[in-house]
């Protein structure tokens, strides 16, 4: 099933992320959420808003350069992954992602299509973000 949520601005993105964070309580962890969309579509903004809704108060930055950031929220550990710069399956393996899944509440994965050969866990949900008129 595909559902569309028109998001007019960052506030609407934050509201959707907050709603999604609230729904996590009814689901079995760990959950893997793939965030897809072009550069500037709002993937990191959505991840930041979701982390805020889960109680993260510290800085939330795009993990583009470090590839992976972990946050201990009131709901549990959230792993935010950005695979944009990944070039090979070996780089993905070197991240040791399997070590991060146990005990996690949620994985937020930006650019999952760069996960090379199915080394990423299958998503429980996918969110496709698009800029209207782009």
Predicted regions and their residues:
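N-terminal pre-Walker A segment at the start of P-loop NTPase domains
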Residues: 1-20
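Phosphate-binding P-loop
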Residues: 23-30
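Hydrophobic anchor at the beta1->P-loop junction of P-loop NTPases
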Residues: 33-35
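The conserved Walker
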Residues: 39
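Conserved lysine of the Walker
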Residues: 43
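Short beta-strand-centered segment that lines the nucleotide-binding/catalytic pocket of NTP-utilizing
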Residues: 56-71
